[in-house]
């Protein structure tokens, strides 16, 4: 069974609150290396939207509280064996509260529920469902955090198994760090596989998942 590589992003706000996506992130996120892109809204501009659409032929999005257009407020997407629910997150109170989000997750009858709005990356399990927040890929400011770290999530879905890679740009070193979480559909918890001390190994592993993007190509794109 072939793995499905899924990008999860939220709250870009480019150019309103951030000038662009960090070049190191763009060097990894190359068109036609991803099978699916899931956007949680507040993209910011047509150019940013077009960039996201260029990354994969299978794009799904929901509307954020600053978005216009006809995207849905919530959505259910099937990828492999997983039902994935999507919502921006401004619709529930308290904002970002998993207990509040769980009602919508039950309504959608999903295995994985992704939401944004808080600009803070996170993973949690409740009622045998995996809740994911990718944070803000541009590090755009919010009412929750004045200066959040840019972040996004890559999911590798194979059968009933999900590997979650959390990418966060370290503000001090200006290098991205990678954490890895493993989850099996319907389980009560997830497994933290590594911490940021092993980020180099994780970078190599996810690059392999993305069809072995050459390191020289990534470096060249990061310099442009």
Where are the language model's segments positioned?
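Beta-strand-turn-beta hairpins that frame and shape the catalytic cleft
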Residues: 1-7, 76-85, 125-131, 157-163
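Charged phosphate-binding loop/patch that engages nucleotide di/tri-phosphates or the phosphate backbone
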Residues: 158-201
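Short active-site segment of divalent metal-dependent hydrolases/proteases
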Residues: 14, 45, 91, 120, ...
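Conserved beta-sheet core of the metallophosphoesterase superfamily
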Residues: 95-163
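N-terminal active-site segment of His-dependent metallophosphoesterases
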Residues: 1-58, 67-73, 151, 184-191, ...
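Helix-adjacent hinge/juxtasegments
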Residues: 58-110
